Amino acid sequence: MAAMLGDAIMVAKGLAKLTQAAVETHLQNLGLGGELILAARALQSTAVEQISMVFGKVQGQDKHEDSYATENFEDLEAEVQFSTPQAAGSSPDFSTASSLDQPLSSSLGHAHREGPAPAYVSSGPFREAGLSGQATSPLGRVNGRLFVDCRDLFLANSIQRRFFHQDQAPVGGLTAEDIEKARQAKARPESKPHKQMLSERARERKVPVTRIGRLANFGGLAVGLGFGALAEVAKKSLRSENSTGKKAVLDSSPFLSEANAERIVSTLCKVRGAALKLGQMLSIQDDAFINPHLAKIFERVRQSADFMPLKQMTKTLNNDLGPHWRDKLEYFEERPFAAASIGQVHLARLKGGREVAMKIQYPGVAQSINSDVNNLMAVLNMSNMLPEGLFPEHLIDVLRRELTLECDYQREAAYAKKFRELLKDHPFFYVPEIVDELCSPHVLTTELITGFPLDQAEGLSQEVRNEICYNILVLCLRELFEFHVMQTDPNWSNFFYDPQQHKVALLDFGATREYDRSFTDLYIQVIRAAADQDREAVLKKSIEMKFLTGYEVKAMEDAHLDAILILGEAFASEEPFDFGTQSTTEKIHNLIPIMLKHRLIPPPEETYSLHRKMGGSFLICSKLKACFPCKAMFEEAYSNYCRMKSGLQ
């Protein structure tokens, strides 16, 4: 009889354990963790005590069988143990209530010393603001979401001991209001930190360093495109016109099959450097300019390139920072969380616990800019993928010079510091701080920021999207007409929005360039005339700026004037300008073939990067379907410029 009761005790206690685990799991799935889980554990411990009381007398009658039952229960407990066991000598003291209130990041800090969770989420400058009294350790914040199981299970073991041996009054104080607060905190979307992650399609592939190695990749691409075009012709599946009846500029070649598009992307992601940068420039164009399918393929190029192997990456760091660069870090994540055309970005943590982002340049890209551009243009021209005149020789020369400057990370660091100073008091924009001790010509280290790129901001409210886009356009005008220095790369990923602090972080100042006042004095008058829809004034200033010679055919002159006036429509509108429904890109798309065919002289060199930034900013507004009046922002910029100019005279 005693043996049977011993077995019953073992089974009952085991069922209580399993019930506890099931209840906790269900509560977590419902998003009702925290206090409710503590209450569930209290009920479980009470149930176990009641079981012991019921069978207590029988247990007392037979000590041997009681010992047998206890031993078997401990065996069962070991098999279904859902708590994280503590290392010998490392168990925290739960004798006081205060020990339970310590931040979990400190309790688990030693266990994670080799590295944080995939914490491309930082406590960061945004996260620290307004969070006094909370743990600043990124592990404390990240573990709250990514490691909820580990944390709760760690506490399960310790709190269970507390309930068996200590007063249960704190749990008894749980109220309906506490439960509701826990539920709301769980459901609040802005409480979730945002992290940047490498594209799932990104692969580890060695960067070809030598010119011969890079040329071989372009040669293989050319051969592959040729066979792909033959297959496309054989299938008679040339691109059809889109639903609006117009064809994209790049939608005119049998070389532009789906298979060939994948070949292009694969090659660009492997060689990286200047060739990939050109592909990224095409990726941020509107669908009216390039084939929509190719735009989607290039989207993968824009989001993430492939990343270099550990050995190649380590060699770059050793060459630039010396063999002991790791001594300056507490932790370094060997797999990057972002990869782009010129470099890849790794998470690291300084000795003091501050998280940083280390951008490491791919080896050989700076030395191969000229050959890469020549090779890619040869392949694209051979396949007739680009319309004649789209990338004339003078534009290629400008791109070469810009890419050479972008490869100088020390120059980029200097401009990042300049913009950080210019925008230090701005309520909406933020520039991450440079970590000088981990910077070199090929390594750039900044504080880690939080948020997500603007291509993921389409789900935000209309009010927030309007504010983001409004500030971006105002910044463009200030960069050109107030700062006289502009970050000219409008890539989505260079703008990170943090919903918790309602700020946008500005990244990547490699494409920054300065503008002389002699240029801006004329250019602001062109924009003034466009905002006034003054056709004659636009023509006069365009000739003065050498956009035109004055001897162009009428078709070219009209196309140029129309394009300028179309861009000025937004600044001419006192009413909210709906970027989501405007037809600016389509109108300009229709003018491109005329301007490519009849242009007599190239436009001023400054306008390539300037129009890339302005056009990209308008495209951001279009993609986010922003709607707000723009006339006042330009009028303010114009008034400030004139006032500043008169003050200098």
UniProtKB/Swiss-Prot annotation:
Motif AAAS motif per record, residues: 338-341
Membrane topology (UniProt): Single-pass membrane protein
Biased composition (Polar residues): 84-108
Domain of life: Eukaryota
Main location per the UniProt record: mitochondrion
Sequence motif KxGQ motif, residues: 277-280
GO cellular component, one term: extrinsic component of mitochondrial inner membrane
InterPro entries (UniProt xref): ABC1_dom, ADCK3_dom, Atypical_kinase_ADCK, Kinase-like_dom_sf
Top EC class, one word: transferase
Positions of transmembrane segments: 215-231
Transit peptide: first to last position: 1-163
Pathway entry: Cofactor biosynthesis; ubiquinone biosynthesis
Example GO molecular function: kinase activity
Entry EC no(s): 2.7.-.-
Pfam families documented for this protein: ABC1
Keywords: ATP-binding, Kinase, Membrane, Mitochondrion, Nucleotide-binding, Transferase, Transit peptide, Transmembrane, Transmembrane helix, Ubiquinone biosynthesis
One of the GO BP terms on file: phosphorylation
Activity control mechanisms: Autoinhibited by the N-terminal domain, containing the KxGQ motif, that completely occludes the typical substrate binding pocket. Nucleotide-binding relieves inhibition.
Compartments, record wording: Mitochondrion membrane
Active site, per annotation: 489
Family to which this protein belongs: Belongs to the protein kinase superfamily. ADCK protein kinase family.
Domain notes: Adopts an atypical protein kinase-like fold: while it adopts a core fold similar to that of well-characterized protein kinase-like domains, a number of features are positioned to inhibit the kinase activity: (1) an atypical AAAS motif in an alanine-rich (A-rich) loop that replaces the canonical glycine-rich (G-rich) nucleotide-binding loop and limits ATP binding by establishing an unusual selectivity for ADP and (2) an N-terminal domain, containing the KxGQ motif, that completely occludes the typical substrate binding pocket.
Protein's UniProt name: Atypical kinase COQ8A, mitochondrial
